[in-house]
């Protein structure tokens, strides 16, 4: 019942998704500013993370006995009174019975009334805290650090703000059916025993909180992640397997980058060749057919294997061809490989 009321409070207050409802009345005093909680990541089917309280504060996991004197400011937030109906359907009724402990037999809904009154917000002065922890180190021998470090899904967080009640508050739940003229009435007006429940809890009870994640380095230094973009956790040691995987990933990335660069350069080079060829009014194809001019031949017929074209076969991507010219020679080789069109004509146009 308490968890349902705090969830409803957080949903209505909002705060951009930073507020977390306190799950249990018995643990409400463990979500005070500078207290430590463990955030456990779930699988992709459950995007919401689970927060677990701990009996420790930030000072407990730091080396040295110096206290943290960061100031905590407080102010009134709002006056909260809420009444709502919750429908019972399928297996949900069994879950609610276990949660609120009332008899819902024959009922189709329960009415929940939460009276928190004026609630206050207590938050740590972030700038002061960041200055104080600049030279502080984490104690890796602390049991909470050892246990959290061994789990890859656990992230240590520090409570930065809490929302508390200021007076004695009450929660009440009634089971019944929805009426047409009235919002709610009992199934058995003569004997409503077991169909209602109320609890009263003291002032200064925490009902919601927000946290900042901690990122802990191998040398014991740590950062408080003050933005949602920064992620907490532990810096991992570079094992042999991890190092090999990291190097392999970098090699593949670099190789792919080089391939894309070569494709880009090759495409630009070919564009220049084609534009240079087609922009000229005279085609060397006609000239090459005249008597005494250079002839395009198939090099395979002369037992010369195919290879990269001397014009467009440069770079990492070899554009191979079987055609060439025996009347031209390069670097002591008595032939040149040239694509039929347009490399053959462009080569001889430049030679001319």
Curated annotation (Swiss-Prot):
One Pfam family named in its UniProt record: Gasdermin
Record keyword Membrane present: yes
Alphabetic keyword roster: Cell projection, Hearing, Membrane, Peroxisome
Family matches, as InterPro entries: Gasdermin_pore (IPR040460), GSDME (IPR042377)
Tissue specificity statement from the Swiss-Prot or TrEMBL entry: In ear, it is detected in the organ of Corti and the spiral ganglion within the cochlea in the sensory areas of the vestibule (cristae ampullares of the semicircular ducts, and maculae of the saccule and utricle) and in the first 3 relays (cochlear nuclei, superior olivary complex and inferior colliculus) of the afferent auditory pathway. Detected in hair cells of the cochlea and vestibule but not in neurons. In the afferent auditory pathway, it is present in the cell bodies of neurons but not in fiber bundles such as the trapezoid body in the brainstem.
Effect of gene knockout: Mice display progressive hearing loss caused by hypervulnerability to sound exposure. Cochleas display features of marked oxidative stress and impaired antioxidant defenses, and peroxisomes in hair cells show structural abnormalities after the onset of hearing. Mice with conditional deletion in all sensory hair cells show auditory phenotypes with early-onset profound hearing loss and outer hair cell degeneration. Mice with conditional deletion in outer hair cells show auditory phenotypes with early-onset profound hearing loss.
Gene Ontology CC: one annotated term: peroxisomal membrane
Any GO BP annotation: regulation of peroxisome organization
Induction: By noise exposure.
Keyword Metal-binding: no
Location in or out of the cell: Peroxisome membrane; Cell projection, Cilium
Effect of residue 343 to S: Abolished interaction with MAP1LC3B and subsequent pexophagy
Family, per entry: Belongs to the gasdermin family.
Purpose of the protein: Peroxisome-associated protein required to protect auditory hair cells against noise-induced damage. Acts by regulating noise-induced peroxisome proliferation in auditory hair cells and neurons, and promoting autophagic degradation of damaged peroxisomes (pexophagy). Noise overexposure increases reactive oxygen species (ROS) levels, causing oxidative damage to auditory hair cells and resulting in hearing loss. PJVK acts as a ROS sensor that recruits the autophagy machinery to trigger pexophagy of peroxisomes damaged by oxidative stress.
Subunit composition and interactions: Interacts with MAP1LC3B; interaction is direct. Interacts with IQGAP1. Interacts with ROCK2. Interacts with TRIOBP.
Entry protein name: Pejvakin
UniProt organism field: Mus musculus (Mouse)
